[in-house]
Structure formats: structure tokens, C-alpha cells
Amino acid sequence: MFTGIIEEIGEITAIAESGDGWRLTVRAPKAAADAVHGESIAVSGVCLTVVGSTAETFDADVMKQTLDVAALGAATVGTRVNIEKAMPVGARLGGHIVQGHVDGTGVVLEVRPGAQWSVLRISLPDDLAPLVVDKGSISVDGTSLTVSAVSPSTPSTGSGTQEGSGTQEGSGTLEGSGTRGGHWFEVSLIPETLAATTLGTRVVGDRVNLETDILARHVERLLAFRAAPEGGSR
């Protein structure tokens, strides 16, 4: 389990095909210094298992399913990633409960910089929209954030994904993406988050990993079972 408090920004230094997946080498001196074979490290919100390490790097395997679901599948050598080691028992829970199991991805639709902070608007897949609430918690690229705004429950048009649908203009908005249509949410980033995570360099059109609150996912599942007709397919 993780808490969504990023410990350092790492860099992917090698990608090797391993079966139908990848083996990544990540340079992250703080995490690698005491990395143990078999332990879990979150890489931009994706829980990976350490299979080897040096003083400054660690290796981890990524299965095809993860590459298909997470934004990590588009990573290249040189990609910067958020790093967090698993939370030890008894540690302070500084963010919220993050499992490292990515639910899907969103696209940065808008960046609104302030004097010392920035607001990001991110698209939200339709199936995740009911799980994201104003003032609730969400993990974006492994970073625990508080949702500062959400789209209406019934958006006007469009889908929750805005891939490749426009170009970045000076306003920091994805041109032609129809930010008024489709599901989205906003997060406000304080200076510490901008400096300590990769979110500070995100631009319009970037794809990010999303993990919704585990409590919301459990409630949704329980309600689905309760609503299912007795003896029906579940």
C-alpha cells in the first residue's frame, strides 16, 4: 500500500522487452539505496516489484495488461516518473490509501497557472466518473490529490477521453477538445507538488495515470450486487 506522497522523481534509463511485457530500469537513488528484491515501489502510480537493483537504480517487470491500461505503456528512455516506496506499518498516512492499481488514464485538458500554483483539468473515463467527487481524493500519476472541481453528472457532449483531439494554444487548453463536454475533474497543485512531482511539467495533451478512491470502488461494487436481480448474472 502507498500513500500518494512522492519521495523523488526518477528517470527511466532502460527498457527491455521481456516476453510480452517490459523490464524497466529506473534511476531513483533514494529508492534504490535500500531496495530489496521482491519489494514494491510505485512508479507514477503503478505498483511494481523490484527484481534487481544497484546503488542508484532498480529493475522491475511490467506485464502487458499494465502497459495497456496505464500511461506507462507510452514511456521511453528518459521519461521522468514519480517514485514512492511502499508505506511501512505504523507510518503516518500523509495522503490517502493508494494501492498502485491504475484504474485508467486521463488526458490533461487545461493548465491554468496561478501566481504560485496551477490548476489542471483532466479528462475522466465514463466508468470512473461516478467514483470521483468534489473534495474527494484521487491519485494522479501516483500523487495523492484533492479534487477541487468535477464536471456535471450528465455532460453535454463527448466522451471522457480527449486523445489527440486538438492542439495546445497559448491559453493552455486543448483546442477542439470540447472541455465543456465529457467528464473531467480539476486538481489544484501547490508549489511543493509542482516541484516534487512530475505534475509540475505536465502540459495539455499529456496522458496521466488515474486511481480512484478504493472506498468508492468498494461501495460501487456492493451497490451493483444489491441492485442485481436475485439469481441473475453478476
Regions found by a protein language model. Name each.
Residues M1-P155, T161, T173, T179-R234:
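Conserved loop->alpha-helix
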